[in-house]
Amino acid sequence: MDEMEDFFENDELDREPSPMGDEAIEDNSGEGGTRRVVEPKLLRTKRLANPRLALNERILTGPKGISALRETLKDFKPNPKDDPYANLEKLMKKYAYWGHLMFPKMKTEDVLNRVETLGTRRQVKVFMIKHRLGETGEDSEHEEQENQKNGIIDDGASDNDDDLFKDLPEKEVTTEKAKNSEKSDQKTAEIDENVEEEYRMMEEERLREEQEAKEAADEDALMEDFGDMNNDW
C-alpha cells in the first residue's frame, strides 16, 4: 500500500504544469477523497476588430455624400437629340459611380433606397438648405471632429453665467436674427421656385418626347398598313 502511495505521489510531482498555470484548481470532492485537477474553461470574449459601418446621415452629409454627387453631376448635360433611355443610362452610371465611392459595400439600388429614406431626416434636410445657400458648414464639422479626436467635450461647465450675457446687446441681437431669418426665408423661397420651374420644364420636355414617340409609332403603323394594302393589290 505504501508503494502505491509513493507511486501516485511521484506521479503528482512529475505531472506537467497545466496550460492554465495558477488558474488550475484541485477538486477534493470526489469519491474516496481522490485528488484531480480541474481547469476552468477558457472564456472567449467576442471583440469586433472592425465595427460594421452603416450608411447614415453623417456619411450622406459628409464629403463623400451629397457634395460629391454635385461634383459628379456638374458636367453632365443630357443631349436632347439622343434617346431618353440612353441619357437615363448615362445618368444612372454616374449615380452608381457616386454610390460606390460613398459606400462600396452596398449595391447601387440599395444605396439609392437608403438615400431616399435618409432624405426625410431632419439633419439631411437642414444640410440641403444650407448647401443650397452656400453654407456647407465644413468649418464647424471639422472643429467638432478635432474636439472628438482630442477628447474635448464642450458641456459649458467652465463658462460663467454672468460672462455669457455680459456683452450681449438685447435689441440688436433680436433685430439681426430677424433680418437673417427673413433673408434665409427669401433665399429658400427663391430656391424652391427655381426647383419647381426646373421640374416643370423637365415634365414638359418628357411629355413632349412621349408625344413625339407616340406620333412616330402611329406613322410607322400607318406605313405598315399602307404596305400591306399594296401587297394585297
UniProtKB/Swiss-Prot annotation:
Family according to the record: Belongs to the CSM3 family.
Composition-biased stretches (Basic and acidic residues): 163-190, 197-216
UniProt feature, compositional bias: Acidic residues: 1-14, 217-227
GO biological process terms, semicolon-separated: cell cycle phase transition; cell division; DNA replication checkpoint signaling; mitotic intra-S DNA damage checkpoint signaling; positive regulation of cell population proliferation; replication fork arrest; replication fork processing
Role according to the record: Required for normal progression of S-phase. Important for cell survival after DNA damage or replication stress.
UniProt-annotated location(s): Cytoplasm; Nucleus
Gene Ontology CC entries for this record: chromatin; cytoplasm; nucleus; replication fork protection complex
Cross-referenced InterPro entries: Csm3, TIPIN/Csm3/Swi3
Family annotation (Pfam families): Swi3 (PF07962)
MF terms (GO), sorted A to Z: DNA binding
Designated name of the protein: Protein TIPIN homolog
Entry keywords, A to Z: Cell cycle, Cell division, Cytoplasm, DNA damage, Mitosis, Nucleus
Regions crossing the membrane: none
Record region (Disordered): 1-39, 134-233
Domain of life: Eukaryota
